[in-house]
């Protein structure tokens, strides 16, 4: 097997329990986003756009839909004879296998895969964040600083810093302390869960960590503190673009709504940095004679006969006559009947809302699970899936 300078590993096994019924039957990275994407499309596209063509995707929880979506990686130009994309479930041995015990253990179980390409560096990514990043710039920074580990960081509001892993740095951006969700943070440089390591160095720490039976086998809790404690040079790479952890209902809704704001930082129309995905061929969308659509994303295959305001309609969505959909996300192939009102909701893929229903919880976000049916005349008054 030939040598690669860098191999990317995407941690995509998360259950996404905070997304409730939206991840009941699929992994968090497979959750639909932005009308025609899935969350995993962002790190995969970033890798391809950065010229990184050897990518491992580490799956675990409910992987079938995610595996089918990735396939051989053709959508991201990752269907390659050398390298390409590889889906990597927890390793199975003759004595039996087990789930990944933590983020570090997930990489440890795939040391043999990485070693096939003999890389100088390894890029560790999360499969559940929305952002666009040129990883080659981060790698150049890592080399320039002669670091053994580089961690991408982003400034967050100080009153939210206690929700993140915080990097305390010197003026030269070298890291002298890492605090996991500190009660009283010293600064607001939050880890983005994006790491570049010198592979030989990381491999040594992974093996040591695996032999420690008290370890949580986690990068934030174990690997990074160990490297800092031993004096390995670690630096913070500041990122200035759009980045969103969409691990909660609120953040997923907000990230989708960001796409229809005038000051949208993500800009999915950027021809220089496209986000790729797998989408079936659909007919053009149809907007009925009495329909009204404003400030919304309406993609292929949609049929709209009602009113749609500040919403995102995924492929194949149908909106009935005299219905109003406002501030909502309607996922693939969902069907909304006649005389329905839906406000500030997420309607899962394939769900059916029969006629004469009202779904509106004021400031709360209403959730309808994928493939669920809301019966005719239903009024949803609490934040529970039907």
From Swiss-Prot:
GO BP: glycogen biosynthetic process
Sites where the protein binds alpha-D-glucose 1-phosphate: 100, 165, 180-181, 191
PROSITE patterns xref list: ADP_GLC_PYROPHOSPH_1, ADP_GLC_PYROPHOSPH_2, ADP_GLC_PYROPHOSPH_3
Record-level Gene Ontology MF annotations: ATP binding; glucose-1-phosphate adenylyltransferase activity
Reaction equation(s) it catalyzes: alpha-D-glucose 1-phosphate + ATP + H(+) = ADP-alpha-D-glucose + diphosphate
EC class (word): transferase
Statement: the UniProt record of this protein carries the keyword Lipid biosynthesis: no
Keyword check for Transferase: yes
UniProt keyword terms in alphabetical order: ATP-binding, Carbohydrate metabolism, Glycogen biosynthesis, Glycogen metabolism, Nucleotide-binding, Nucleotidyltransferase, Transferase
EC number, as in UniProt: 2.7.7.27
Pathway of action: Glycan biosynthesis; glycogen biosynthesis
Pfam families (UniProt xref): Hexapep_GlmU, NTP_transferase
Assembly notes: Homotetramer.
Function according to Swiss-Prot or TrEMBL: Involved in the biosynthesis of ADP-glucose, a building block required for the elongation reactions to produce glycogen. Catalyzes the reaction between ATP and alpha-D-glucose 1-phosphate (G1P) to produce pyrophosphate and ADP-Glc.
Family: Belongs to the bacterial/plant glucose-1-phosphate adenylyltransferase family.
Entry protein name: Glucose-1-phosphate adenylyltransferase
Organism of derivation: Clostridium beijerinckii (strain ATCC 51743 / NCIMB 8052) (Clostridium acetobutylicum)
The encoding gene: glgC
């Amino acid at each position: 097997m030939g040598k690669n300078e860098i191999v990317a590993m995407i941690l995509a096994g998360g259950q996404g329990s905070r997304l409730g019924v939206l991840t009941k039957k699929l992994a968090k990275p497979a959750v639909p986003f932005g009308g025609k994407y899935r969350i995993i499309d962002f790190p995969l596209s970033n890798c391809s756009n950065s010229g990184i063509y050897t990518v491992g995707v580490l799956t675990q929880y409910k992987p079938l839909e995610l595996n089918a979506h990735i396939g051989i990686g053709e959508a991201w130009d990752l269907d390659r004879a050398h390298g390409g994309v590889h889906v990597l479930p927890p390793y199975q041995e003759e004595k039996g296998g087990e789930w990944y015990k933590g983020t570090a253990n997930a990489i440890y179980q795939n040391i043999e895969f990485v070693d096939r390409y003999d890389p100088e560096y390894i890029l560790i990514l999360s499969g559940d964040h929305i952002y666009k990043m040129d990883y080659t710039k981060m790698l150049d920074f890592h080399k320039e600083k002669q670091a053994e580990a580089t961690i991408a960081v982003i400034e967050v509001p100080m009153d939210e810093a206690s929700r993140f892993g915080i990097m305390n740095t010197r003026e030269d951006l070298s890291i002298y302390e890492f605090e996991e969700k500190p009660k009283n943070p010293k600064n607001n440089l939050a880890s983005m869960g994006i790491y570049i390591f010198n592979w030989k160095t990381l491999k040594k720490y992974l093996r040591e960590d695996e032999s420690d039976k008290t370890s949580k086998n986690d990068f934030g809790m174990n690997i990074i503190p160990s490297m800092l404690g031993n004096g390995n040079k670690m630096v913070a790479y500041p990122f200035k673009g759009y980045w969103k952890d969409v691990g909660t209902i609120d953040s997923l809704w907000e990230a989708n709504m960001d796409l229809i704001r005038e000051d949208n930082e993500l800009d999915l129309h950027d021809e220089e940095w496209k986000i790729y995905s797998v989408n079936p061929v659909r007919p053009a969308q149809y907007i009925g004679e009495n329909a009204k659509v404003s400030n919304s994303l309406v993609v292929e295959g949609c049929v709209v006969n009602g009113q749609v305001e500040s919403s995102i309609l995924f492929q194949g969505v149908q909106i009935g006559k005299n219905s109003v959909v406002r501030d909502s996300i309607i996922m693939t192939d969902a069907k909304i009947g006649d005389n329905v009102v839906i406000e500030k909701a997420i309607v899962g893929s394939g769900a059916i809302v029969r006629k004469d229903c009202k779904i509106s919880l004021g400031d709360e976000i209403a959730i309808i699970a994928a493939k669920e049916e809301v019966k005719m005349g239903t009024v949803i008054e609490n934040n529970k899936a039907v």
